[in-house]
Structures are given as structure tokens and as C-alpha cells.
A protein has these predicted regions:
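Short alpha-helix carrying the canonical HExxH Zn2+-binding catalytic motif
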Residues: 1, 5
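Short, intrinsically disordered, charge-balanced linker/junction segments flanking boundaries
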Residues: 261-262
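Beta/coil-rich, acidic/histidine-enriched accessory regions frequently appended to metallopeptidases
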Residues: 106-258
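Stable alpha-helical elements in mature extracytoplasmic
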Residues: 23, 77-80, 89, 93-96, ...
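Non-catalytic, well-ordered alpha-helical scaffold segments
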Residues: 21, 75-78, 82, 94, ...
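A donor-sugar binding/catalytic signature common to diverse glycosyltransferases
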Residues: 6, 11-12
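Acidic/His/Gly-enriched intrinsically disordered linker/tail segments
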Residues: 14-82, 86-87, 104, 121, ...
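Active-site and adjacent substrate-binding regions of carbohydrate-active enzymes
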Residues: 8, 85-88, 96-100
Length: 262
């Protein structure tokens, strides 16, 4: 991606560094979307949105600033492009990018040069967009979530997020439904995350469902769930010693050794 954004077209100053890193990150993600699918694509964007939202509590430097962090240049820059892509549509976005690269090939550019090409293909308020996504250090969670909800898996993920502080008894049926569904595996991992402070007896039905997914990543989350492996869970836990992931095997072996004398 840097062959186009960085090599073919280069930012004129560090203030506009997102034109390289944000663009390269987003286009690499678009390529991964073609390989791994939409659920992967939206799961990545969701994860980065959480990181950016958390970082904005202490990081007050926006995208259009030479001192912005790598997370801001790369990931918020990519997020800004995703928002723009969604707002003006795929056809207009691709046309603007193509025109931008052709017009400024082997030259230095600034953010306004890019916006000029956007305004040629779409009736879009680039000034407002810039204020919200490039000049404000805060992450626009409301707008981000509205776009993320277009993906069915992330819609469920956002519902799960709302239940983080809900007592287990009140959300258990929903958690079981998620684990039994064909929703993307990262959403099921979020279910495991919400079980970390619960007793084994209260969550054993959920663990049976999670283990049955046979997804190595979900099972690895279970391997790390307990400080000590419950005696009643030992037999099921031992099946992770033969999982496809060597890291899961390592975690399981250590946890079993740490939990049982023999």
C-alpha cells in the first residue's frame, strides 16, 4: 500500500502524515477484507475503535498534527477514511482516490489536495469531516457505532458491550444464544471475557458451549479464564493439551501443573 501512499504520493509535512500511514493502513485492510471477509474487516475496525476511544482519554493530539501518535496516524487515519468511504459511496470514493493519485503522482501533497478530489465527485462537507475526524482528538463513538452496526456480528458485539455490568443471571440466556449461533468468533470471545469474574458452577453450561465451538482462539481464551483450574472442569480442560495451537497447549500445561499436585 505504501507504493501508492508514501512513495507515489508523499505528504508535504509531518502534519499530513496520515495521508501515508492512514491510507496505507486502510488499503491494507481492504485487501484483507477480500481475503478474510466482512466479519474480519468490521471486527478489526471495532477493535481499533475501542483502542482509539480509550486512548482519547489521555491523548489529546489529533490526526492533523505533526506530534500525533502512531495509533492516531495509522488507525484513526484509517478510521477517517472508512467513514468517508461509507459517506460518499464506493464508486465516488474509488474515483476520487484514482484521480488524487494520478494528479499528484511523484509529488508532495497536503490534506486539502485530497479534499479537492473528494469535492469533485461528491457533495460532501469536507470541512465538517475534517473538524470531527482530523482536527478533534476525541473519537466519535456514536458515528462509529452507527457504521459498525451495518455488520450483523458487530451489532451483536455492541449489544454484548451494553451487558458488561449486568448480573450474569439476567444475561445468561443471551450469552448462551450467542455461543450457539454462527456469529463471528471474536463476538463469542467477548462472551468469555464477561465470565472471568464468575464462579465455575455458574458458568459451566456456557463453557461447554464455548468449548464445543472447537475454535482455537475461543478455547485459548478459556484456557486463560481461571487462576486455578476447577476440579470439576479438569477433564474438559485437559482436552486443550492437544489443541492445534501450541500456545494453547503451553497455557493448559502450565495451568494444570499449577492447579493440581499430581
Amino acid at each position: 500500500a505504501h507504493q501508492w501512499f508514501g512513495d507515489l504520493v508523499t505528504a508535504e509535512s509531518s502534519k499530513h502524515h496520515w495521508l501515508q500511514e492512514g491510507f496505507a493502513t486502510y488499503y491494507a485492510l481492504l485487501a484483507e477484507k477480500e481475503l478474510y471477509g466482512e466479519d474480519y474487516f468490521y471486527s478489526y475496525l471495532y477493535e481499533k475503535a475501542q483502542q482509539l476511544k480509550f486512548a482519547s482519554r489521555t491523548d489529546t493530539i489529533p490526526v492533523l498534527n505533526a506530534k500525533a501518535s502512531s495509533l492516531t496516524f495509522y488507525e484513526k487515519g484509517a478510521w477517517a477514511l472508512f467513514v468517508l468511504h461509507q459517506k460518499i459511496g464506493d464508486k465516488a470514493f474509488k474515483k476520487a482516490i484514482k484521480n488524487y493519485l494520478k494528479k499528484h503522482a511523484f509529488q508532495t501533497v497536503n490534506t486539502n489536495d485530497f479534499f479537492v478530489e473528494i469535492e469533485k465527485v461528491a457533495a460532501f462537507d469536507t470541512k465538517l469531516f475534517s473538524k470531527v475526524w482530523l482536527e478533534d482528538y476525541k473519537f466519535n463513538t456514536l458515528e462509529a457505532n452507527d457504521l459498525l452496526k451495518k455488520n450483523a456480528a458487530i451489532k451483536v458485539q455492541l449489544e454484548l458491550d451494553q451487558l458488561r455490568n449486568t448480573p450474569l443471571a439476567e444475561k445468561k440466556d443471551f450469552l448462551m444464544k450467542v455461543l450457539q449461533s454462527d456469529v463471528y468468533y471474536t463476538v463469542k470471545e467477548s462472551v468469555i471475557f464477561q465470565l472471568r469474574k464468575e464462579s465455575y458452577d455458574d458458568i459451566k453450561e456456557l463453557l461447554v458451549l464455548a468449548m464445543a465451538t472447537k475454535n482455537w482462539s475461543i478455547r485459548q481464551k478459556i484456557a486463560n479464564l481461571f487462576p486455578k483450574v476447577p476440579e470439576a472442569f479438569k477433564a474438559d480442560y485437559e482436552t486443550m493439551l492437544t489443541d492445534a495451537s501450541y500456545q494453547t497447549q503451553e497455557i493448559a500445561l502450565f495451568q494444570l501443573w499449577n492447579s493440581f499436585e499430581n
